[in-house]
């Protein structure tokens, strides 16, 4: 009986140990599975976070590059406008300077009036401030033509230059510094744009 009790105790111990080992193995296996799931979720989260970060970085780079391109375009357009304005102002200043020479203006007026039909009645309108000196030069150079139908008058609306009006048909030709500069600018502007064109 002693053996039976001993065997029974040994069997209980053995069964208890086996059960404890089985429970222990189940706990370890469950812990390993949970750990693997946690690692897998963490790796997936890390991959998603990395992909999101890379997309955000690429989007930021793309936006920054586009903003840089736009800023460069705006800068170029601004420089072109400033150069165009500088060119236009310089052209106008040069025309005003040339038109400030009364001898040049007198020669120009004479050449223009000589080229038109002799029967036409012309009115030459001059800037008020230059009128007296220009009138003297024109009277000397035109002589008889003044009596034959060319009339010289002062005109307030001209800063530099002159206007010629054909009396019998009512046409007026504007040779003021502003108009000549505008015509020259319109003529030269396409060429100027080609010179300064960057993009």
From Swiss-Prot:
| Keyword Cell wall biogenesis/degradation in annotation | no
- Keyword terms, alphabetized: ATP synthesis, Hydrogen ion transport, Ion transport, Transport
Look up the record and report any one GO term of the cellular component aspect. proton-transporting two-sector ATPase complex, catalytic domain
Q: Which GO terms describe its biological process?
A: proton motive force-driven plasma membrane ATP synthesis
Which branch of life, at top level? Answer: Bacteria
Q: Which terms does the record give in the GO molecular function aspect?
A: ATP binding; proton-transporting ATP synthase activity, rotational mechanism; proton-transporting ATPase activity, rotational mechanism
Q: Does the keyword Isomerase apply?
A: no
Belongs to which family?
A: Belongs to the V-ATPase E subunit family.
Its annotated function is as follows: Produces ATP from ADP in the presence of a proton gradient across the membrane.
- This one is known as V-type ATP synthase subunit E
**Organism phylogeny:** Bacteria, Pseudomonadati, Spirochaetota, Spirochaetia, Spirochaetales
Name the gene: atpE
């Amino acid at each position: 009986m002693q053996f039976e009790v001993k065997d029974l105790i040994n069997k209980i111990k053995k069964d208890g140990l086996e059960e404890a080992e089985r429970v222990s193995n189940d706990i370890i296996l469950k812990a390993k599975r949970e750990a693997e799931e946690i690692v897998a979720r963490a790796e997936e989260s890390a991959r998603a976070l990395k992909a999101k970060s890379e997309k955000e970085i690429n989007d930021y780079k793309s936006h920054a590059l586009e903003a840089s391109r736009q800023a460069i375009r705006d800068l170029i357009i601004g420089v072109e406008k400033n150069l165009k304005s500088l060119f236009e102002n310089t052209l106008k200043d040069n025309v005003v300077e040339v038109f400030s020479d009364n001898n040049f203006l007198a020669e120009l007026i004479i050449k223009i009036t000589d080229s038109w039909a002799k029967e036409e009645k012309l009115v030459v309108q001059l800037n008020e401030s230059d009128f007296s000196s220009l009138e003297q030069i024109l009277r000397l150079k035109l002589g008889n033509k003044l009596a034959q139908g060319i009339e010289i008058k002062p005109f307030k609306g001209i800063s530099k230059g002159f206007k010629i009006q054909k009396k019998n048909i009512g046409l007026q030709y504007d040779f003021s510094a502003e108009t000549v500069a505008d015509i020259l600018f319109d003529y030269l502007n396409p060429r100027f744009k080609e010179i300064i064109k960057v993009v």
